[in-house]
Structures are given as C-alpha cells and as structure tokens.
Amino acid sequence: MTLFSSISSISNPMTNSKSRISSFGSGTSMGSNSIACGGGCGGGSGGILGLGLGLGLNLFGGSRGACGGNSGSSNPGNGPCSGGKCCGGSCCGI
C-alpha cells in the first residue's frame, strides 16, 4: 500500500472561486468526484484537472482506477476505466 500526501488549489473560471482539496493516504476520496489512490495509476490530464506523478491522484477527471488509463473527456486513456467506465476497483471512488 502506497501512502502519499497531495494538496492542490483549483480555480473554477465559471464561479471565479477557489477550492482547496487535500488528499492523504491510499484510496481516499475527498471533494466532488475526486479520486485518489496509491501507486500504479499513472498521470494524464482529463476533465478539469488530472494529476498522476505515479501516485494516481485524479481530481474531477471522472472515474479512474489502478487498472490504468484516464477517463477524462479530453483524454480517454487506454485502460479498462477509459471512456468514463468504472473498473469497480478501489480507485473508482464516488
């Protein structure tokens, strides 16, 4: 099990407001449809914001899991979770 800590500040141009989301641990979900899982998920940018860095933190990018790929609308990815499908794993979150 991989543990990590990540803090990201997101600005929403539609509401001109900022929300601060922090995720700690493995398989922890915080915020609206934010998915965080430890290890093996990789990077990629999709939806509004997708962060990987090998930690597999994906914010507002849709359902994604350790099975690989990013299901964000702008980056369909190439794994079983691509295209908005949830793989049913621990990373699928909300």
From Swiss-Prot:
Region Disordered: start-end pairs: 1-25
GO BP, sorted A to Z: sorocarp development
InterPro entries per the UniProt record, alphabetical: HssA/B-like_chaperone, HssA/B-related
Entry superkingdom: Eukaryota
Coiled coil: none
PANTHER family, per database record: HSSA/B-LIKE PROTEIN 1-RELATED-RELATED (PTHR31059), HSSA_B-LIKE PROTEIN 1-RELATED (PTHR31059:SF5)
Similarity comment: family membership: Belongs to the hssA/B family.
Protein name: HssA/B-like protein 51
Organism from which the protein derives: Dictyostelium discoideum (Social amoeba)
Gene: hssl51
